[in-house]
Every structure is written in structure tokens, then in C-alpha cells.
């Protein structure tokens, strides 16, 4: 519970900062950061968001603006008090908002930002994590926030950090509606009271904010007045100064008197110059919205500044697309690709505010899901429509045909932008590292643009070395006899490159695409073909490699020769495999496990088993179909065939078949249901190899716990006793 202190009738409540926020503030206060100026950008950005909210509410309920029609941001430096004040006429905060938003409830980004900071990230990232307000403590020793929401009284929040803050009802000067942030600056931060410095920071970070930012400065100026006016003014001053004598008529000291002797002749009154104090108001962001200007007149620096003010990013954007659409529908858009993926790119619960929607230059909202598909959620920018109604609601947006057309155009322009970027290999590499998952998600979700998206994919292949290659480049290198694009999915480039599945394909000189991200499994389910060539997994049944007559004949002979062994192995393994066949894909491995054409690969099975909310019924039928393929040219398989032909009931044959199957499961990327039994078989093989007699070991250690004997195969489909092999 907060402490309550009573000052007369005024009630002051003290709250402790939530632990992570207190830690963050301590980090901000006690670490040296060179670019402290970003505090002003963050506070202006928060003010702009508050103004956006009240303007949006007023579109459906104009009475919300009765408490103040003008939407603006004022900056007021006061050198004598050493304070810098920011005032906005935004939505304001209720008492509950004040307590929750400024201290007691940690945002999801608080911890992530601290981790990023400690890993060496720049303090200027703070706004991207939703905790920009606390940057005020970079320059302030104490912060006071006075706020008034239409639904509540005026309240004041105050904190000098130190782990706690106070909230009280504020009976000072009424602010109507909005928020006033008063920063009591540290002694060494008074530069932010200087006109030049404030202007410089606002121009650098906030010149594209959509509301007027006005700087209020107390200045002195010389004023020229006539003698009569001077006397009146002096007279007024005299009344105010009680301690001065009132005998003589006041004389104004000459600052720069107009010494004209013949003034009488010219019938002109004498004039004097005096100094007076006045408040100078200067609007700092008169720039009209950048997206309304002609792209040819805008420099890359201006785009960069706008991008930074829009996103709170400290780095420049990677690429930009500025376009307008005219005709039946009219809108302008300015889209940016960032250099990095945000920390919460695929967090579903977080409302994305990456594209701001305007209607005729009036901001409507910044979390419009209908404006851009999920897979392009990293694109930042603005869209300004001439056709949508100003008072459009979220419900109307969902049904809006205009918005559907805008969305279609945005997707088209984004894909154009990616294709343009692909021509610059260095920058495309950065883009692909950050956003390849988005492109693959697009292939899974967006059937209309699947072909265009597939052209943007880049993969390592068996022939690409350290570089990544496009599917178009792969097709251009295909052999004349090759009809399909071969690929393999797995956990890493090293794992798939050494896989048994690629042995013969590579030996025959065919290129294999290595797909090593979990999302590739989903992507390739939808991407059935590219440029007229089907995509074929080398880990699934039915792999057809171009063969000449001699190879076909040899394959038929092998099938006939090993037919009985295949039948026997199927009997021994029973339900563990759907069938046992001769392989055309193995070279140096004795066997491998392949899956049916429509079943999951081993990699997909691994991914699905890792899902916390998996559907076990789907797991059942998708992972059941396994085929064991044996290599007819391998000595192990040949020896096994000979043993089986000599005595198909030989226990050693059964043991070896099970051991081969389980080893093939592992090398093919599957997991074992009973790894302990498999391990015990391997240990027994090692003992045999070392010539250790098991009976002797047991006799030497009579007190040792004897492990349960591994049951024979007949009684259990998972295990069999290992017989000594010649």
C-alpha cells in the first residue's frame, strides 16, 4: 500500500517503483551516456502520441476537445529556475494512468532494454522499448508531471528517482487538458535551457512531428517610444516603486535619443529607445509533411531524419519507397525498411504501430492491422488517404474496400522495394539476415505474391560455398537431364551437408539446396515449384534421379537380389516402418529412414515435438509413415543378406536389423522413443569388440545392481538380446 502523508488538506501518496523500472532508472542515472539529448525527442514523441489519442477520440466525439481546441506542444526553458518544461494539450492521464504508466507496471520492453544496454546497445534505443519517459533522468535530478484527463481531476507526479515517486491532487494553475512535464535540470545540463541547443535538438530529432512545437523564450528588445509615452510608462513604473520620491517629473535616461534640434520646425515629437522584456514564441517545426512533397525534391538526409523521428531508431533506414497512387483512389505512402529486426518482431500480443494511417493529413491511428499483412510487420512508414472518411472507426476499417486496395498497393510496392534492394548484394545480405523469416512467412500465407516472394529467397547450397544463392541462380546451373530442384531441411548447414540423403545426389553432380531454418519447413509446404521446376525433398520417398539404361538395369537386379532381405526386415521391424526398399540415394551409408511424400520430415517432426501447444492427434498420423531404405552396395547390408539367407531365424540377424534401424533413425534426424535400450545394445557391441566377457564382469562385481536384462525381440518390438556376431 502507498504511504499517505497529509499536508493540511492535501493528500500525498508515495509509491515504490516496480523493481525493473527502479533498476532501469539507476542504470540511466549512474552510467555515462554521451548523447543525453535524446530525452527531448522521447518527451516530444510521448506528447505527440497523447495528441494523436485525443484527436482520434474527438473524431467520433467532438466534445472531447471542449477542454481545449488547440493541439500543440510547448517548450519553456526557465534559466532562473533551472527548469525545462514541456506542455502538451493531449489526452492527459487519470490518476490510475499516472501510477501505472509512470512506475508501478513494467512494460514488456523494460527488461529487454536493460539487457540490450548491458550488451552495449545505444541509450537512444530507449523509445523502441516503450520506456522513453525515463530518459528524462539523463538530464534531470527531479521530474514533476502535472496532468489533466477529461475524466479525472488534475494530478501531479513527482520523483527524484531514489526508488519511489509521489502522486497528489494538484491545485496549482489549471492546465485544461494534457500534460506538463517539468524537468529540474542537473547543474551540468543547463545547455538545454539555451535557445540554440533546444532548436538544434528539435530540428535533429523532431522536426517532422505533426503538431506545432513552440519554443517560449524570455527576451529583451529595444522599443522606440515618444516622450509622452515614455512619461506615461515612467509614471506607471513610479507608482509601482513605492520607495522612490514623487517630486519631479520623471526623465528617461537616453539610450539612443533622437537628437534633432529642428524637431519643433518639423512638428515631430522626440522619441526615446527603452529596453523591455517580452516572451518570444517561435514554431520550430514548420516543415510540411514530407510525404506530401515531391520525392525528387527530398534528400536522403531528409528521409533519414523523418525515419528517425517516426521510429525513434538511432540508425538510418536501409531502404525507402515514396509513392502516390492517383485515379479512382488517391493516397500517398512513404515506406521504410529498418536495418535491424525489432526485439519483439513476432510477438503476437503486442500491437504493432509500424505504419501510421492519415486521412487528408489528419492522423487516424498507428495500429491498423488491415493496412499491411502480418509478414510485412517490420515495414515502417505513413499512408495518407484522400478517400477514407475522417471519423472512420476500427470496425469500418475492417470492412473498407478502399483499405483493401491501399493494402494491395502497399504489398506490391514493398515487393518492388525488396527486388530493387536485391540488386545491391551487400545491403540485401543485411536485409535478408534480419527479415528472411518474414519473406518465408509470406510464402506460407500470401498465395497471390508467392512467386514474387520466392524470387527473393536466398539459400546455401552444396555448390554455393559460403555465399547464399537464389533459386533463379540454382535453375540457371541445372544440368540438362535435371527436372527438379533438390533440397534438404535440417538444423544446420554442417548437419545437412554431411547427411546420408545427399550422398548420391551430390556424387551425381546435382546441386542440393540447404534449408536450415524451422520456418523453411512451412515455406516449402506451399512452395511446390519454382520457374516450372518442382521442389523435391531428398529425405522423402520417391526421389527420382535421372538414370541411364545401365543404371536402371542395375537397380532392377538389386531389387530382385535383396527382395527377401527387405521382406524379412519388414517382418522384424513390423509397425515401426511402413516398408523396406532398396535405396537410390545412398553411397557410403548402409541405410536411412525416409518419410512419405505428404508426411513430415525428421526436421519437421523435431520442430512439432518442441511445440508447447501441439495437437497430438495430428502428430499421430503425420509422423507415422517411415520407410527404411537400404544401400545394396554396402558391405554391412550384403553380409546381413547372406546371414539371413543362411538362417532367417538367426537371432543375430534380428538384433542387427533393429540396431541398424535405430542407428538410421538417429542419422536421419529422428529421435528414439527408447534411447536406453539402444544405448545398452551399443555398449554390448563395444564389449564384444574389446573382447570383454559379460559373465566375468558380473562375477567380479556381485554387489553391483544388475541391470534388467534387455528383453528379446519376440516379446517386445523395441528390443532384442544381442547375440555374439562372428
Curated annotation (Swiss-Prot):
Note how its activity is modulated. Answer: In the resting state, through the dimerization of its C-terminal domain, HSP90 forms a homodimer which is defined as the open conformation. Upon ATP-binding, the N-terminal domain undergoes significant conformational changes and comes in contact to form an active closed conformation. After HSP90 finishes its chaperoning tasks of assisting the proper folding, stabilization and activation of client proteins under the active state, ATP molecule is hydrolyzed to ADP which then dissociates from HSP90 and directs the protein back to the resting state.
Annotated site (Cleaved under oxidative stress): 126-127
What post-translational events are described? Ubiquitinated in the presence of STUB1-UBE2D1 complex (in vitro). ISGylated.
Give the N6-acetyllysine positions (modified residues).
437, 483, 626
Region Interaction with AHSA1: start and end of each range?
A: 215-554
List the Gene Ontology MF annotations in alphabetical order.
ATP binding; ATP hydrolysis activity; ATP-dependent protein folding chaperone; protein dimerization activity; receptor ligand inhibitor activity; unfolded protein binding
Question: Where does the record place the modification S-nitrosocysteine?
Answer: 592
Superkingdom, natural source: Eukaryota
* Keywords, alphabetical: Acetylation, ATP-binding, Cell membrane, Chaperone, Cytoplasm, Glycoprotein, Membrane, Methylation, Nucleotide-binding, Nucleus, Phosphoprotein, S-nitrosylation, Secreted, Stress response, Ubl conjugation
Q: Does the entry feature the keyword Cytoplasm, yes or no?
A: yes
Pfam annotation, one family? HATPase_c_3
Q: Which residues carry this modification: N6-succinyllysine?
A: 219, 533, 579
* Region called Disordered, residue ranges: 221-272, 697-726
Give any single GO term for biological process: regulation of cell cycle
What does its UniProt record remark on the domains?
Answer: The TPR repeat-binding motif mediates interaction with TPR repeat-containing proteins.
Quaternary structure note = Monomer. Homodimer. Forms a complex with CDK6 and CDC37. Interacts with UNC45A; binding to UNC45A involves 2 UNC45A monomers per HSP90AB1 dimer. Interacts with CHORDC1. Interacts with DNAJC7. Interacts with FKBP4. May interact with NWD1. Interacts with SGTA. Interacts with HSF1 in an ATP-dependent manner. Interacts with MET; the interaction suppresses MET kinase activity. Interacts with ERBB2 in an ATP-dependent manner; the interaction suppresses ERBB2 kinase activity. Interacts with HIF1A, KEAP1 and RHOBTB2. Interacts with STUB1 and SMAD3. Interacts with XPO1 and AHSA1. Interacts with BIRC2.
Q: What does this protein do?
A: Molecular chaperone that promotes the maturation, structural maintenance and proper regulation of specific target proteins involved for instance in cell cycle control and signal transduction. Undergoes a functional cycle linked to its ATPase activity. This cycle probably induces conformational changes in the client proteins, thereby causing their activation. Interacts dynamically with various co-chaperones that modulate its substrate recognition, ATPase cycle and chaperone function.
Name of the protein this chain belongs to: Heat shock protein HSP 90-beta
Q: Which organism is it from?
A: Oryctolagus cuniculus
Gene that this polypeptide is encoded by: HSP90AB1
